[in-house]
Curated annotation (Swiss-Prot):
The lineage of its organism: Bacteria, Pseudomonadati, Spirochaetota, Spirochaetia, Leptospirales. The keyword Protein transport does not apply. GO terms for cellular component: plasma membrane. InterPro entries: Glycosyl_transferase_4, PNAcMuramoyl-5peptid_Trfase, PNAcMuramoyl-5peptid_Trfase_CS. It is a multi-pass membrane protein. Catalyzes the initial step of the lipid cycle reactions in the biosynthesis of the cell wall peptidoglycan: transfers peptidoglycan precursor phospho-MurNAc-pentapeptide from UDP-MurNAc-pentapeptide onto the lipid carrier undecaprenyl phosphate, yielding undecaprenyl-pyrophosphoryl-MurNAc-pentapeptide, known as lipid I. The keyword Cell membrane applies. This is Phospho-N-acetylmuramoyl-pentapeptide-transferase. Keywords: Cell cycle, Cell division, Cell inner membrane, Cell membrane, Cell shape, Cell wall biogenesis/degradation, Magnesium, Membrane, Metal-binding, Peptidoglycan synthesis, Transferase, Transmembrane, Transmembrane helix. Disulfide bonds: none annotated. NCBIfam families: mraY (TIGR00445). GO terms for molecular function: metal ion binding; phospho-N-acetylmuramoyl-pentapeptide-transferase activity; UDP-N-acetylmuramoyl-L-alanyl-D-glutamyl-meso-2,6-diaminopimelyl-D-alanyl-D-alanine:undecaprenyl-phosphate transferase activity. It is found in: Cell inner membrane. The gene is mraY. The chain crosses the membrane at residues 29-49, 70-90, 93-113, 133-153, 177-197, 209-229, 251-271, 273-293, 298-318, 349-369. It comes from Leptospira biflexa serovar Patoc (strain Patoc 1 / ATCC 23582 / Paris).
Amino acid sequence: MFQWIYESFGNDYGFLRVFSYVTLRAMMAGLTSMFITFIFGKSLISFLLSLKFRESVRNDGPQSHANKSGTPTMGGLIMILSLTISTLLWGNLSNWNVILLLISAILFAGLGFTDDYMKSVKKIKGGMRARTKFIVTILFAVTITTLYFYYTGKSNVNLQKGIVFSITDLFLPFVKGPVWNLGIFAVPFAIIVLIGSSHAVNLTDGLDGLASGTVVISTATFALIAYVSGTPSAANYLHIPYLPGSHEYSVFLAGLSGALLGFLWFNCHPAQVFMGDTGSLFLGSTLGLVAIMLKKEILLVILGGIFVAEAVSVILQVGSFKLTGKRIFKMAPLHHHFELSGWSEEKVVIRFWIIGIILAIITLSTLKIQ
């Protein structure tokens, strides 16, 4: 909204020029969403409790989780609400990809809400049928990625070097320039990234503050990458693809980071509220979509190493048990394995945060080391 105000009245009122600066709008988006979450978070928790939106803890989980039963869930609602408001206020709504990011977040939050509602209110064990949930996820992913490739166009141009690259090109960390043009496989690949990221974050959401803390590290890192990718001089200096308009993603990502920090205030141990699938599905899908838009799909494996490890641990555990009848881990996802190995919940979470920060530093280093 403020960007539109500047574009409409900036020539008449010079002080409105301040709203043209992406850095200012990004900071304000982060503060706006964070304060919305702070101010209304406690009221939302009371509201969720009154509606009996409570978490049911699995019986075969760690014994230390028994006291979590009854904790309100669907806390992702406050994050998607604050993100939407901050984006509408501070985002550049003439940038189609910013709108697509917001639409994607709302769709996946809606899917997660439906699943949470069926589990906590309707008391349907497991929530939505796995097949139904997977089909809806695929439909959302196909729609979003198709819209992205259709409206973004056939190519982007690095204006500084005159390098033309296709949006179907694949880039690798530490390698300068595209390594392979995916062609017709670009959309299926993007769909896999989107779905995989969504479910990986969903699996990570099992301890107080684990998912919210690790995701905010990733969103903040992507916000920096988005800003330099959309700034010609910075992209030229770092020899990375210049993506016109991508610096506007940093406003959206700053808003999401603020929402996550505000939510973490209530979600840290002992958690007053859980994000539920309402939060985890939209957070994961957003990371995947941003990676696609920034041409950092493979880099997401490094930045989101925690999420990858959690997902791989589940795949290995299930595969091993089906093939050999034996389990590799004491329990999957991976964070439960460490809990059953004697680590306290707080220790697992903080150590995973530390690893996430290290991975973020490595991710940022790839921008220059190539």
